[in-house]
Amino acid sequence: MLYENRVITKKEVKKILKGLENLKKEKFEKKSSSEDIHELIESLLIKRIGIDAGGKMHTARSRNDQVALDIRMKIRDDINIICQCLLDTIKSLVQLAKEHQETIVPLYTHLQQAQVGLFSHYLLAYADALFRDLDRLYVTYGRVNENPLGAGPIGGTSIQIDRQSTGKMLGLKGIVENSIDATTTRDSAVEYIAAIAILMTNLSRISKDFSIWSTSEFSFLQLSDEFSSPSSVMPQKKNPDILELTRGKTSHVIGNLTSMLSTIQGLPSGYSRDLQQINPSIWSASKITISALLVMESMLKSVIINKKNMKKAAEDGYLIALDLAEKLVHNGISFRKSHQIIGRLVKIAHKSGKPISELNKSEIKNEIKGKEVSLELLIKLIKSTTITSSLHDRTSQGSSGISEQKRMVKHRLGKINVYQTGIKKRSNDVQNSLNKMNKKVKALTK
């Protein structure tokens, strides 16, 4: 860019670029008197090509805008990696959902059985949450992928430069225009960590559910040995270590976000050395999130689902209660009155230790006295209502109804394809820009 704007000569740009290419092949000493990597590279370049040419490399730039650029480019790359890993995890969830569209399972509120549902419905719920994480990262990417370079230390420069051109060469879309804003703020980095903190929270919740469901008390699923560990003293144990570590690492990412906000909230305008303290939090959160997604995807592909235990748990409860109440509503009885009637039947069935379907005529009759409901109708509804029929009856959009599962699985698979195209294009756009820049470098160094 400096050469194109006639700030340096062709001879100088050739010496600088060749010198930098040679430095890429060298190993740097860990101990150096240089303050940071930028100063080290400049000092090494000057030693090799002289200060007349090497001393011009830093023209119209500052470490303040260089560091801001480096952080943005690193986050940009991490977002693309995380988006691909996240999409792969969503694929695993949706594929598992496709295989379990008729696998019956209890749905819980307050950790108490609430309604009968389908395992696919549960899996799609988390797929949808992760899709929103993907959306957040997509939006954040746009704010991250902007060029702060050329802002100088804080107030810009009198030297003729082209910030748009620099950004284009690096695959950045537009510039962070205000030079104070470009060098001072790190809100795009905070936004990124906030997005992956929410993402990790969703992974933690999946881990919690799977951890509970893998216990002998539930035995809804079994983790493969790859994602479990034995006890050192108890031979029967199979501990869900990976799920527990995912929960634990989520706390680290949330801590990283809190640390960054705590650092930034007290800073004045302009660059302060405090900003260096947030960088380890960014790198740590990225690394944890990528690892957690890779593990989650693999775990979902290998988990063994115990359909029989899931269905038995659903049959042993009173999960058709709401469905019975709604059938009374279909027959002209108010929902509140229906709720009271079925509630009484559940209570007597629970006391008797049997399902509602096994209540006899006299037991039902005693509980509906004065309720203005036909005994014959109620008995007919009880006999015809099962957990399976309930799932066929549910047709509201987004419900656990069997027909809705087929529609939602198909829709989510299509959504995955759209996102995959977008992620690939975004990565290709960056790589194409860098390739063009490298061609320019080669042409100038011939």
Predicted regions, residues:
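A helix-coil-helix interface module used to build multimeric assemblies
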Residues: 1-156, 161-163, 167, 227-230, ...
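Short, well-ordered beta-strand elements within core beta-sheets of diverse protein domains
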Residues: 1-7, 74, 121, 190-198, ...
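Helix N-cap/coil-helix junction residues
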Residues: 7-8, 172, 333, 354
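A short structural micro-motif
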Residues: 18-26, 186, 344-349
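Leucine-rich amphipathic alpha-helices with coiled-coil/heptad-repeat character
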Residues: 27, 93, 97-100, 104, ...
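Short runs of predominantly hydrophobic/aromatic residues within well-ordered alpha helices
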Residues: 38, 42, 189-192, 321, ...
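Glycine-rich cofactor/substrate-binding loops
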Residues: 53, 234-446
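Charged, flexible cofactor/metal-binding loops and thiol motifs
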Residues: 71-72, 79, 83, 87, ...
